[in-house]
Regions:
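N-terminal extension/subdomain marker
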Residues: 1-91
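Generic structural hydrophobic/aromatic packing signal, biased to beta-strands
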Residues: 124-126, 157, 172
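Histidine (H) residue identity feature
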Residues: 29-32, 54, 146, 151, ...
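A sequence-level detector for short glycine-anchored, His/Arg-bearing signature motifs
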Residues: 141-158
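Alpha-helical oligomerization segments
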Residues: 159-179
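Short, solvent-exposed loop/turn segments at secondary-structure junctions
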Residues: 130-133, 152-154, 177-179
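Short alpha-helix boundary/capping and kink motifs at helix termini
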Residues: 61-144, 165-166
Length: 179
């Protein structure tokens, strides 16, 4: 199987890989290549935190047409940040709400960070879906917001909410589909 068969829609957005399919392209090179090319409207942080760090997940949302997404970095009050209802799989959120337990694990730096800071280290990405986009039968998009990236972070925030340890405001990348 070759890369074109594995990533039929997103090959042009993928970081360069070797013959064993391991990413070999440097992060900074990838970001510049995307900004100089097909994703020139994307914020650097999202190219790095989402597409470069999770390239195997791109196909999940390729039907949105990544080039049409526009992003705004916003600060939201805690009450506006959605909970499990924004997840494609709402049970995923439940599996990570035990932030205090996870923070005790020395390997879970994110849980420790969020428990200490009351927020995430980098904003989650939510697709604004007020217009009820139904672009694919593969993924049922949630309304009014669908979580695209940051599943563990949003799960941990829900755990912080339950413990009354969440900060009152959080940064969020809001994605909109422009036609």
């Amino acid at each position: 199987m070759n890369l074109e068969e594995i990533y039929p829609i997103t090959l042009q957005y993928q970081p360069f890989r070797d013959e064993d399919w391991r990413v070999v392209e440097e992060e900074s090179h990838y970001v510049h290549r995307m900004l100089d090319g097909v994703l020139s409207n994307w914020p650097k942080n999202l190219l790095k935190e989402w597409l470069y760090r999770h390239p195997d997940c791109m196909e999940d949302y390729a039907f949105l047409n990544l080039e049409r997404l526009k992003f705004t970095l916003e600060t939201w009050p805690l009450e506006r940040v959605p909970g499990s209802e924004a997840f494609k799989d709402e049970s995923f959120c439940d599996n990570f709400e035990n932030i205090e337990e996870r923070a005790e694990d020395n390997n879970d730096w994110l849980a420790r960070y969020m428990l200490k800071e009351g927020t995430w280290n980098t904003p989650i990405v939510l697709l604004e879906n007020q217009d009820r986009y139904n672009l694919s039968t593969q993924v049922q998009l949630k309304q009014p917001y669908h979580l695209l990236e940051g599943h563990r972070r949003l799960s941990f925030l829900n755990g912080l909410r339950r413990l009354n340890k969440a900060r009152p405001h959080h940064q969020v990348w809001l994605a909109k589909i422009h036609t």
